[in-house]
Amino acid sequence: MDLQITRNIEQLIALLRLPEVQVSDIIEIHQKPFGLKLEVQGARLMLTSWLLESKSHDLDNALKRNQPERFNGLPQRIFTIKSQLFVSALCPEQFDAHQWFRLCQKQRQFLSQLGGGE
């Protein structure tokens, strides 16, 4: 993994005030009310968020509300796994920790509005 990506991941974890973890190609962190998965893909980062204790979700409603302008034009993939609603994006190569942080905040806000998280 590229040193710059490693440093950006460390900075993202600090910005989100998450517990320190060993940086690797795939990181999954659970800190209520959200789950976060970071996957390094070449020089890019796949950032995925979900509510840990989602009471229910409406995939159709989430898909309707998933508008590009909500995420500054960055396409989001909305999907479910075992009744959990996830939102995921492959970040552009030039994104840094602060841009990842803002995207993560937007994903969390989106999920909270749908599912009643914080």
Regions found by a protein language model. Name each.
Residues 12, 59-65, 102-109:
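Short, Φ-rich (hydrophobic/aromatic) sequence segments
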Residues 3, 57, 97-101:
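Ordered, soluble secondary-structure elements with a strong preference for glycine-centered loop motifs
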Residues 24-26, 42-46, 82-86:
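A generic structural signal for beta-strand entry/edge sites
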Residues 82-105, 109-118:
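Well-ordered alpha/beta subsegment
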Residues 1-35, 68-80:
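Charge-rich, low-complexity N-terminal segments
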